[in-house]
């Protein structure tokens, strides 16, 4: 099983929306829909097909000294260290992770 990191620029046709052009990110195992977190804290339900795939992570992949661990729905990504301590990735860490891999896509955060 893999978890995917997606990035998004709000592409709706409502140019008057205060979120138009903002960047959003999501980590999810879903291939259809997911909740996308935007820079101002807004969360939107979005079809994955409208997002840009940034990176796939295997569930045993290392991020620093921790391994990727997934539980629950809508991209609640957790990391587990060598001592089996589990923690949820924070919003700031999600953005840092997106920025680490974003150069592989046309989207710039």
State what each model feature region is.
Residues 77-89:
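A short, exposed loop/beta-hairpin motif centered on an aromatic-Gly-Thr core
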Residues 2-52:
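Basic/aromatic-rich interaction segments and small domains that mediate binding to polyanionic partners
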């Amino acid at each position: 099983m893999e978890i995917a990191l997606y990035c998004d620029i709000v592409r709706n046709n409502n140019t008057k929306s205060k979120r138009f052009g903002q960047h959003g990110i999501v980590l999810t195992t879903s291939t259809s829909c997911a909740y996308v977190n935007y820079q101002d804290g807004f969360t939107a339900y979005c079809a994955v097909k409208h997002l840009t795939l940034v990176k796939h992570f295997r569930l045993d992949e290392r991020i620093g000294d921790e391994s990727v661990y997934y539980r629950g729905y809508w991209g609640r990504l957790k990391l587990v260290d060598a001592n089996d301590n589990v923690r949820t990735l924070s919003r700031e860490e999600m953005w840092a992770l997106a920025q680490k891999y974003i150069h592989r896509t046309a989207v710039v955060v």
